[in-house]
Design a protein with these regions (language model features):
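N-terminal loops that bind phosphate or other acidic moieties
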Residues: 1-45, 49-270
């Protein structure tokens, strides 16, 4: 299941609501998959509009987030600052007991789901701080280590599913949180291809601090370094240091011409 297709930024780009967006749609797809016979699910994380610690998924599966007075919390990440416990009286046990593999697109921690990715989901100033506090509270209630890498992916979605596994199975053995970049690279045979290459060229629109936290470009440059293969990065702009060969696009001519010129610049640096 591609989480971005159900809970993604593209569908709501013109009406971002970082405080109240949720992952409910992904939960609906999980429940539907179980009724169709699925026993394990792979979730491709990334590109979500929500920062809700996966509570939307839990809600779709019948759980309910409650405050200390026993009242159900409104949807979204912001209300989680009042999270006291999660009610499981109506939980869809069959769907909850599926095996989950979560392919994360970032090594971000739960708090970084808000501080690093909140702004691109529309969060500003105090909203970022509020969502960061909400992630900490969700970690506290679910027993999640707030410093866990990858648990900030997709708005903290691994937090809720790991809690689900602990609740139903007594451990998180039925939820695997993996580096999506590393997983896909292995499936494509990239480690072997990069090791036998003379040069690797990769890139993205903007190279910044997020690029090296589990994104494709960071995964590829890591593999190249491990193999001792020279690596060059082409990007529209560079806002973070790297020891790779770099070539920003010139913004002159067609895109094809810019890419060709940038590739030439990398070759000249070798």
């Amino acid at each position: 299941i591609d989480v971005a297709s159900a809970t993604g930024l593209p569908a709501v780009q013109d009406s971002l609501d970082p405080l109240h967006a949720d992952s409910y749609g992904t939960g609906v797809l999980i429940a539907d998959a179980e009724t169709r016979g699925a026993t394990s699910i792979v979730l491709g994380l990334g590109g979500t509009a929500s920062i809700d610690a996966g509570m939307g998924i839990l809600t779709a599966l019948g759980a309910a987030a409650h405050d200390s007075r026993g009242y159900a919390l409104p949807k979204g990440g912001a209300p989680l600052v009042q999270l006291d416990h999660i009610d499981t009286a109506q939980l869809n046990i069959k769907a909850g007991m599926l095996d989950f593999t979560l392919l994360a697109d970032t090594r971000a921690t739960p708090v970084q789901a808000a501080t690093m990715y909140g702004p691109q989901k529309g969060a500003k100033g105090e909203q970022v701080a509020l969502l960061a506090g909400a992630m900490l509270q969700a970690c506290e209630v679910t027993g999640t280590d707030a410093d866990s890498a990858y648990y900030g992916a997709a708005g903290g979605l691994p937090i809720g599913l790991s809690w689900l596994s602990h609740t139903l199975w007594g451990s998180d053995e039925h939820v695997r949180v993996l580096s999506g970049g590393t997983h896909v690279a292995a499936a494509l045979g990239l480690p072997e291809k990069i090791a036998s290459a003379d040069l690797v060229i990769t890139g993205e629109g903007r190279f910044d601090e997020q690029s090296l936290t589990g994104k494709a470009v960071g995964t590829i440059t890591d593999l190249a370094r491990q193999a001792g293969t020279p690596v060059g990065i082409i990007a529209g702009s560079f806002e973070h240091d790297t020891d790779a060969y770099c070539a920003p696009l010139s913004q002159e001519g067609s895109l094809a011409q810019q890419l060709a010129a940038a590739a030439g610049d990398i070759v000249k640096q070798l």
